[in-house]
Each structure stands twice: as C-alpha cells, then as structure tokens.
Design a protein with these regions (language model features):
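Short, conserved phosphate-binding/catalytic loop or strand-edge motifs used
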Residues: 48-54
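Conserved small/polar residues in nucleotide/adenosyl-binding loops
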Residues: 228-235
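N-terminal catalytic cores of NTP/NDP-binding nucleotidyl/phosphoryl-transfer enzymes
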Residues: 7-40, 45-47, 58, 137-139, ...
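Mixed-charge, low-complexity segments
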Residues: 204-213
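Hydrophobic alpha-helical scaffolding
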Residues: 16, 20, 24, 62-66, ...
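N-terminal low-complexity segments that are often proline-rich with Ser/Thr-Pro
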Residues: 236-240
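Non-catalytic interaction/regulatory segments
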Residues: 2-9, 49, 59-154, 160, ...
C-alpha cells in the first residue's frame, strides 16, 4: 500500500501502520464530504482512532439526522470514485494562518496559535479540500476501499466544557470489504447478546427517558428473577 508523507515522498506503508493511515485518510475524505454538503462547516480535530476515525465539526445551528449521515457517507463514496490525488505542501506560519483565514477555519487558526513554537505548518489537499495535517495519507482517494459512518455525538472543543459543543461524527474504515463485513457481523452479534435487548424481549424490565436513561424498571417477571438471584438476608448472615 503506497502512502505519501508531508515532505512529498511516496513509500510503502509499514504493515502495522496501514489501518491508521487508512482511517486518517477516511477522516479527511469525510470532512471533504461534509464541507461539500454544509459549506458553513468549521472543522476542529479529525484523527484516526484505535477502532476507526472521527471529526469534530461546528455546523452552526444545523442538526444532523440519520439520513444526513447516510448522505455524508454517499458523498464520501463519490469522492473516492473521483480518485483525487492527495498532495502535501508546507507553508511558513504567516502564509498558513492566511490560508486558514481565507477558508474560515477558525478552530485551526486557534490551534495554530497554541503551537507558538512552530514556524511552518504542513497541509494535505485533495481536490478543493485542504486540511492542516502532518500525515501520512493514502496517495489517492480511490485507495480508500471499505468504510462506514457509524454515529454522531457531542464533544466540547479541546475537551473543555467551558467551550462550545461540537458535533462529532464517527466512522470505521478497513483494508477491504471483507474486514468491514467481519466487523459488522461482530457488532450484530454483540447487539444480539446485549442484556438491554434480551431483557426487554423477555419482559424483564423497561426503561423510560423520563425516569432516566440506563435506569431499568423491573416488570413482574424481572422482579421474580431478581428475588431468585439475589442473596437472601439469611445467606448474607451465614457468609459473615
């Protein structure tokens, strides 16, 4: 698998780094898709993670539905088919800040200010999209073969609750479709074993957001099970 580094040289990717590079590139492609669909998007951080990737983004007042996430994934697939070359470049601080100002990347500008000792910054570009990044990345968008957007959540900028809550969009990416299919199968099996699903199906308990998420209310069958599985006061006394 070929990858490109921030200095522009291309080399084979070490096998133990393949998933990291794939997922990091997937984060960039997802950000490009988001920017195409939501031009007002202002991006924070978008790293690869142990299990996938995410990007934190300020969408203003825009709220995303499941259909919106599906459309973002669809746009990602379109970008992959466009087979855009991923190219790095480096700018001195003043030019880098100016570029981010022109692109209205306010969170990137703030992050650059935090890196006061840096005299230059590296960027990666694919088509119209530019992201501040140290890389490395896949050489073309078409090299991203298997991915899926999984969920959205909230995340504070810089993990500080005093800062603005951003939208975090998560995804997974793998070397090929077979690995993605295996992951999806594992997720389905885990859902089937989930005690919350089994308990509701067996009529053991119910939940209500008005009571509180994660707080089960036992139904008669569940209460009976609880009585049989909980130690009696006599058993507790004997164990002392």
């Amino acid at each position: 698998m070929k990858i490109i580094y921030k200095d522009g040289h291309v080399d084979e990717c070490p096998q133990d780094q393949e998933l990291h590079v794939i997922r990091h590139t997937a984060a960039h492609i997802m950000a490009q898709a988001i920017k195409r669909l939501y031009p007002q998007a202002d991006f924070a951080f978008g790293p690869a993670t142990e299990n996938g990737f995410y990007y934190d983004v300020d969408l203003g007042d825009q709220k995303l539905s499941d259909e919106d996430l599906a459309n973002i994934e669809k746009e990602m697939r379109k970008i992959c088919k466009e087979n855009l070359a991923i190219k790095p470049f480096i700018l001195p601080r003043a030019e880098a800040v100016k570029l981010m100002e022109e692109r209205k990347e306010n969170y990137k500008i703030e992050h650059m200010a935090d890196l006061a000792d840096e005299t230059e910054f590296s960027f990666f570009q694919q088509g119209e999209y530019v992201d501040m990044c140290i890389g490395p990345h896949l050489t073309y968008t078409k090299a991203l073969k298997a991915f899926k957007i999984t969920q959205q959540s909230g995340a504070y900028w810089k993990n500080d609750k005093e800062n603005k809550m951003l939208t975090r969009i998560n995804g997974v990416a793998f070397r090929n479709q077979e690995e993605l299919d295996a992951w999806e199968k594992e997720q389905q099996e885990a859902r089937e074993r989930d005690h919350r699903k089994i308990g509701k199906e067996m009529g053991l308990f119910m939940t209500d957001d008005l009571v509180g998420r994660g707080l089960p209310m036992f139904l008669p069958a569940g209460y009976t099970c609880l009585l049989y599985t909980s130690p009696s006061p006599r058993d507790t006394e004997r164990s002392r």
